[in-house]
């Protein structure tokens, strides 16, 4: 038992004690401006002097600790138009600066970890598409799968407790706790859940959520490694490379019962596989569903008794892979049985042998994707292309390049689809929407403008991947065409496409 407790011990010597004074350093907000605020009003507002950012932060923190932090005097609004902004903007300023500071302990640990293990940073940053070759290789040999939505109703104190193991600065933690309680309501939607992965979410909350999820995953992987005769190999796939540097290598100290080894014995399963992206995870296993049920209740107990999150066991379904379609990262994946009959002739006797082989299929679901295109005003809810309003000073080449770029990104992201029919329809919607947009700008009919563009315009939308593959295989046109019709995984994609993120 001491062995397990030592495994979870935290290296207190690496705690950082003096992070609070960094809130008033100018370069911190330069970093925050670079990574998060970008072209925000903080650095572009008229009359704002970037040398006085620390003064502004001091005023904001002082007013936060007051009873009514949003009551500003008329003189403040006149002297500094910065205070005329809304409450969400104040929270963004502090959260962006605070996020840079709390990431310092993790970034230093990353550097020391990479130097100790002699691992290149690029090995830690895998592409999103690398998940699918893994699923393609493993899932055809597995039988049961669970699609788990990780609970996100996290109490504020749990998020603060996670940072306490890394930061021993009482002032910083007190400010963080006060800040979370003050601005938490701005992150709650009408459906009463936290939109963790929305674009407008501050970098700080993404960092806190990621660190919380990593703590859960370390408990999970620890139990997985202890319960299996085979050591699992894991590779990190970081969807917020700016926001979070590396998974924590140490665990929170926990206390186990005397029957811990007995509990582990019930979970022995060398064929358990785990994949996660954002708030969704997949558990897959071989043989009977009994072991999957045990892991299911283990996860429920872990969330309820350690993280204090109520999680109903009924939300985790155990399904057979051959009868279930898994929706993950914009693809609908499934394992299908392909039957083939082979006739064997031996002398005067002949035999018919029925071979059933499992095949991993990935299909692009067209209905959700059309809904995403409809929200972006490329088509209506039925998938009929419509013209998109543009600026009057936009040139025709800029409009065409924009549509081509969107089409190219979607084509690359969905290049792993087993069937290309849905992808062709998406290209058709974007192509016709581009033509209608140009016709609307020049006040001409679609037919007239399409004749003006000619057939070359159609080829740019329809045969881009085929041209690229023909350059790779210049002498074997049939090979490139066959590859174009098949699945292609691009290992340079590190973030999910905006039009795909419609879950």
From Swiss-Prot:
Keywords: Chloroplast, mRNA processing, Plastid, RNA-binding, tRNA processing. Its main location: plastid. It holds the Pfam family Intron_maturas2. The keyword Nuclease does not apply. It is found in: Plastid, Chloroplast. One of its GO terms (cellular component) is chloroplast. Belongs to the intron maturase 2 family. MatK subfamily. Usually encoded in the trnK tRNA gene intron. Probably assists in splicing its own and other chloroplast group II introns. PANTHER family: MATURASE K (PTHR34811:SF1). This is Maturase K. It comes from Eucalyptus globulus (Tasmanian blue gum). The lineage of its organism: Eukaryota, Viridiplantae, Streptophyta, Embryophyta, Tracheophyta.
């Amino acid at each position: 038992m001491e062995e397990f407790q030592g495994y979870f011990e935290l290296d207190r010597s690496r705690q950082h004690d003096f992070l609070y004074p960094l809130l008033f350093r100018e370069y911190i907000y330069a970093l925050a401006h670079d990574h998060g605020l970008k072209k925000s009003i903080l650095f572009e507002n008229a009359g704002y002097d970037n040398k006085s950012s620390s003064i502004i932060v001091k005023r904001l923190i002082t007013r936060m600790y007051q009873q009514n932090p949003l009551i500003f005097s008329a003189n403040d609004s006149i002297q500094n138009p910065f205070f005329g902004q809304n409450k969400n903007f104040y929270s963004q300023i502090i959260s962006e600066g605070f996020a840079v500071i709390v990431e310092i302990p993790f970034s230093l640990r990353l550097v020391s970890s990479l130097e100790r293990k002699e691992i290149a940073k690029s090995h830690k940053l895998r592409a999103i598409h690398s998940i699918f070759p893994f699923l393609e290789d493993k899932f055809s040999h597995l039988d049961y799968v669970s699609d788990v939505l990780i609970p996100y109703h996290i109490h504020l104190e749990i998020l603060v407790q996670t940072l306490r193991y890394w930061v021993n600065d009482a002032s910083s933690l007190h400010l963080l706790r006060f800040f979370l309680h003050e601005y938490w309501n701005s992150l709650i939607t009408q459906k009463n859940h936290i939109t963790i992965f929305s674009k407008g979410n501050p970098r700080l909350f993404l960092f806190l959520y990621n660190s919380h999820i990593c703590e859960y995953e370390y408990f999970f992987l620890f139990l997985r490694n202890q319960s299996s005769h085979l050591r699992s190999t894991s590779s990190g796939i970081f969807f917020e490379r700016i926001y979070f540097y590396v998974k924590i290598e140490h665990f929170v100290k926990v206390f186990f019962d005397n029957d811990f080894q007995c509990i582990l014995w019930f979970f022995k399963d060398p064929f358990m596989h785990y994949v996660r992206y954002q708030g969704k995870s997949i558990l897959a296993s071989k043989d009977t569903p009994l072991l999957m049920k045990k892991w299911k209740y283990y996860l429920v107990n872990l969330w309820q008794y350690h993280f204090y999150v109520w999680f109903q066991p009924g939300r985790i379904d155990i399904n057979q892979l051959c009868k279930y379609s898994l929706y993950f990262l914009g693809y609908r994946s499934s394992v299908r049985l392909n039957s083939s009959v082979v006739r064997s002739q031996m002398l005067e006797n002949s035999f018919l042998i029925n071979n059933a082989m499992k095949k991993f299929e990935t299909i692009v679901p067209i209905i959700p994707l059309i809904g995403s295109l409809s929200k972006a005003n490329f088509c209506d809810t039925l998938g009929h292309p419509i013209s998109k309003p543009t600026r009057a000073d936009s040139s025709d080449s800029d409009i065409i390049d924009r549509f081509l770029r969107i089409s190219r990104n979607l084509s690359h992201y969905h290049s792993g689809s087993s069937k290309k029919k849905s992808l062709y329809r998406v290209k058709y919607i974007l192509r016709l929407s581009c033509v209608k947009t140009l016709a609307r700008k020049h006040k001409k009919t679609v037919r007239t403008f399409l004749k003006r563009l000619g057939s070359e315009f159609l080829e740019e939308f329809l045969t881009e991947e085929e041209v690229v593959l023909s350059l790779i295989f210049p002498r074997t046109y049939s090979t490139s065409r066959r590859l174009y019709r098949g699945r292609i995984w691009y290992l340079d994609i590190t973030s999910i496409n905006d039009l795909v993120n419609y879950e």
